[in-house]
Amino acid sequence: GLRERVPFPQTTNVPTVAERAGDFSQVYRDGGPFAIFDPLTTRTEGGRLVRTEFPNNRIPAGRMSPIAQKYLSEVYPLPNIANQRQSNFANTVNKGIYNYNAEVARLDHIFSASNKIFGTFFRNHRDEFRSNNGLQGTVANQGQWPQTRNNHGGIFDWVSTLSPSAVLNLRAGFTRFLETNFQTDVQKFDAKTLGFRQLPGSYMPRVNLDQYTNIGVGSQGVNTVDNTGSFQANYTKTFSRHTLKYGGEYRNIRSNPRTTGNESGFFNFTRAYTRRDPNSQDATSGHSVASFLLGYPADANIGAGQARATQWNYSALFVQDDLRLTRKLTVNLGLRWDFEGPLTERYNRLVRGFAFDQASPLADRVRNAPGAANCPACANLKGGLLFAGVGGVDRSLFDPDRNNFQPRIGLAYQLSSKTVVRGGYGLYYSPTGQFGPQTGFFISTPYIAGDLQGRPGIPEIGVNTFENPFPSGRAVPPGASAGLLTEVGRGISFDDPKRIVP
């Protein structure tokens, strides 16, 4: 076992007592005056956008977000370094905790001079406790608390001497890897106690305040389960000057990662909504804590999605001849064939390429749209995402690539009783390790804020606030139901199903 403790002392910024009360009268930038402005007063004067300053740089209590106030009173730690607005919170005892245990057991049995077996069982367990923001032990913590990795499996091996010149070796193995990253303290927390009503789950939303320490995790963490089963067979035959080796290998790999993004919500607050001019980046106005107290995030989102349940097979065959040409010269000749089977997903939650040759469902509308005559590409609009196992599309992510032959050659020459020169050449193919995009099966609902640039309509900024960030609810992943119209008008990604193994 291993026990390791690594110090991670942190000094960061947290809102001051005055800022938590909406009082920014003592805030200065570069020694000069500083002001916060009311975003609901945005108007045009003399061709420029202007806002009215909050009197005395204080936000009225009636304008403050109840959720933001609860965050600042119940979640954000108070400063512990006096008389400082910046670098006013220190955690000198913040440390990473790493615990690792490993067990290995092996049993050998010899049946006879020509047959023997062994079996091995192994297991290891690792816990990592590490805080990224120095708030370990609280619901505001970010980081691994804990991140747990478990790995266990076994091997069975049989060696049989078939004759004085022939040996057969068979081996089977299985490995299971589990990884979780859940915040134990956050699991005890109910986000509804802060005033949230629409957000699913109990995990605290992730909140970023520009120039301040960030809090919360925004999701229920990561949960991954990977299983690998394998079988190998090797046969060695010696005759004359030759040592021939034949063999093969088969693996079945199953990977089940669960990552759903910010399923409890992510909110980012900047100076934008409390600046003097929304179109101007000046250093003497606007404050992220002021924007937070007003309940106006610059951007936010909430995610929803499903896990993966992927599987693929790997096979290989090889032959090798160690030929002793002379007493001093040995030549190794070999050939290996690898086949990485196409990846599939248990419920076909994969994008499989792009329909370059299929007419878009929007083709008629685009062809008849005003100005289409000046758009050559509009005359015959094609394309859209294709989904595994839908509409006759193959379930696999890639087409099979079965021509991965790899020649090998090596030389060993004995120059003297103390010197041997060796050289060789080999061609190798790399595993792709591609899981493919899940467009349509994961979706992020964006926060629709007021007009950040201060154009007409800015007074409607108060409609969507911290209290009601997603009035239409969280979007539901459509899966493959939209067909070629999936993510239309947005950026998309896909893997070429005819890709070549590098």
Where would I find each of the regions flagged by the language model?
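Short acidic-glycine motifs
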Residues: G1-P502
